[in-house]
Amino acid sequence: IEATLKLFETAFANKDNAYFHLLSGEDVVLQPFEVIEKQWQQRFDFQAMMTCERAPQYAYRFIMDSPHADSNWQRQLTGKIITKLQKAVAKVKPYHSPIYFGSQWFSVTRADWEKIMPFTDEYSDFFRHKLVPDEHFFQTLITEKLTNQIRLSNDNRRQIIFDKNVNNGNSPIYLDLLKLEQAKFNGYW
């Protein structure tokens, strides 16, 4: 989350930047930015291009801080045991607020980012020691603080595929040229 906020801070400093698209270093941009902006306006009326859904199955990530969050041992045996313990605790100790979940990769307008910025420190503090905060941070912030000000499209126009047979589905798979061409044809960005 810290890296994402730094990226946005740097991009926001340039007054000419009207649109912000968060991508991974391994992403492939499939459409020219002019096409992306035109589709974004025509099909989505510049709604925040972000996936967001309620996901109570991830309550274990919220009920307590995780000592192994964002550590080298999070996905090693010790970290996996701690995560299993947190899941057990979550079954006994319910989390009473909705859990919002979605992809970290999203697009927002400058106007929407201006609305998000005042809340980033507060939410950074909450998520600092939580598991997989990038899948919850912006969705939770917007839904809790800006639900009447920022409309979410629940679509980020990214072709992201998780395959349980590859690294247990923990990371998106790499797409071959055929899948990339098909994604472009299907209007993914």
Model-derived regions: residue spans:
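ER/Golgi luminal nucleotide-sugar-dependent glycosyltransferases, focusing on the catalytic module
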Residues: 1-189
